[in-house]
């Protein structure tokens, strides 16, 4: 486990990778976001998306899955908030890489046992653009 003191600002960390299949995208959409461009390749081609793509909810879930597999975890006490963007669609069978960049940190004024960390996390498609980015602030335990 890593603590607040272990967070290195400005050091980009590759957290992990995942490749969503066509079946995975359709299965998720069928249950959680049944839009034609997530379910049917022909309908997707004729849509504003220009082809089958993962739901934004699925894209975020992929980032959470990759993050859950990371080898070094922070002692996170709470999520304080986030801003999320989905600038490009996630396509089937394209590898995605989750990358985190800690931007700032400070000791909490009201709770000296924790610190506040703000980071930018992006999900990058193989050989292409970011398909999601988010800035998050969370409480991280300080070393005992």
Cite the ranges covered by each PLM segment.
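Hot-dog-fold acyl-thioester-processing enzymes
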Residues: 1-81, 143
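HotDog/MaoC-like acyl-thioester-processing domains
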Residues: 1-9, 86, 90-144
């Amino acid at each position: 486990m890593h603590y607040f003191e272990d967070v290195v600002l400005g050091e980009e960390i590759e957290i992990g990778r995942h490749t969503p299949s066509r079946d995975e995208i359709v299965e998720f959409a069928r249950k959680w976001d049944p839009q034609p461009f997530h379910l049917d390749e022909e309908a997707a081609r004729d849509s504003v998306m220009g082809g089958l793509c993962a739901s934004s909810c699925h894209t975020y879930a992929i980032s959470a899955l990759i993050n859950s597999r990371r080898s070094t975890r922070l002692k996170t006490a709470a999520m304080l908030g986030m801003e999320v963007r989905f600038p490009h669609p996630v396509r089937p069978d394209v590898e995605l890489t989750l990358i985190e960049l800690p931007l700032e940190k400070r000791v909490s004024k009201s709770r000296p046992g924790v610190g506040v960390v703000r980071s930018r996390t992006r999900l990058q498609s193989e050989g292409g653009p970011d398909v999601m980015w988010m800035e998050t602030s969370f409480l991280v335990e300080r070393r005992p």
